[in-house]
């Protein structure tokens, strides 16, 4: 048993024959030889894949072809769509024709509407007869009355008599106005002096009748 354990623990040399000890984890090679082995594998894989220089050359050749005129199909499709989306040049004549057309339509429609209204109103207007209405007489009388009152108010008020009717003496504010309608001075103010025409007796009798009505008892009816 001891011999077997010693035999298993004995170191093993590198499989490449470099003289160093190998490791079963690195396929029996030493660390240096294992690194070189990995580098060789990587280099061999890189030769199979296309180099970076060829890729850059392809990317440079594409814009050159586009400049020469050989445009890819995708680029031509994009150009065609963009050209279809862009509006074409609009001429001044087309704009003028579009602006004039609505105005002509509006004017023609207005003329038709006016002609129709005239046709409808024509027979009715011919059949109608204007009526003349005279203002009522009461209204005319009421309008004339204020005018007459205004004319009277505009007239100058009559001046009061300031002279005695008998002696023609100026009495001013000290004159006495009699019931007969004349003004007299202090001497001629009495009715018996200036022979007054006013009937004082009849006036007094009328006042007595109004103030003292006749009182008559009811008659006794016989049974």
Swiss-Prot record:
Recorded GO MF terms:
DNA binding; polyubiquitin modification-dependent protein binding; zinc ion binding
Report the principal subcellular site: cytoplasm
**Which residues are involved in binding Zn(2+) 3?**
178, 180, 194, 196
Q: Name one GO biological process term.
A: cellular response to tumor necrosis factor
Would I find Ion transport among this entry's keywords? Answer: no
Spell out the residue ranges making up region: Disordered.
Answer: 41-155
Which residues are Zn(2+) 1-binding? Answer: 14, 18, 30, 33
- Superkingdom: Eukaryota
In this chain, the A20-type zinc fingers fall at 8-42
Name the chain's protein.
AN1-type zinc finger protein 6
Mutating residue 180 to S leads to what result? Impairs interaction with PEX6
Q: Where in the cell is it found?
A: Cytoplasm
Amino acids binding Zn(2+) 2: 164, 167, 185, 188
Explain the purpose of this protein.
Involved in regulation of TNF-alpha induced NF-kappa-B activation and apoptosis. Involved in modulation of 'Lys-48'-linked polyubiquitination status of TRAF2 and decreases association of TRAF2 with RIPK1. Required for PTS1 target sequence-dependent protein import into peroxisomes and PEX5 stability; may cooperate with PEX6. In vitro involved in PEX5 export from the cytosol to peroxisomes.
> Biased composition, Polar residues: where in the chain?
77-110, 137-148
């Amino acid at each position: 048993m001891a011999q077997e354990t010693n035999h298993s623990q004995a170191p093993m040399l590198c499989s490449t024959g470099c003289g160093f000890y190998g490791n079963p984890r690195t396929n029996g090679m030493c660390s240096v030889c294992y690194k070189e082995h990995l580098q060789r594998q990587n280099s061999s894989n890189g030769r199979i894949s296309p180099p970076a220089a060829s890729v850059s050359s392809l990317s440079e050749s594409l814009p050159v072809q586009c400049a020469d005129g050989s445009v890819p199909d995708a680029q031509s499709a994009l150009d065609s769509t963009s050209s279809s989306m862009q509006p074409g040049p609009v001429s001044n004549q087309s704009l003028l024709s579009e602006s004039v057309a609505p105005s002509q339509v509006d004017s023609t429609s207005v003329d038709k509407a006016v002609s129709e209204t005239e046709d409808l109103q024509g027979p009715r207007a011919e059949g109608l007869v204007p009526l003349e209405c005279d203002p009522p007489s009461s209204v005319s009388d009421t309008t004339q009355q204020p005018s007459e009152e205004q004319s009277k108010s505009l007239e100058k008020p009559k001046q009061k008599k300031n002279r005695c009717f008998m002696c023609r003496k100026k009495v001013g504010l000290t004159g006495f106005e009699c019931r007969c309608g004349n003004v007299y001075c202090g001497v001629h103010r009495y009715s018996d002096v200036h022979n007054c025409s006013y009937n004082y007796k009849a006036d007094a009798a009328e006042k007595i009748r109004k103030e003292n009505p006749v009182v008559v008892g009811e008659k006794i009816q016989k049974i």
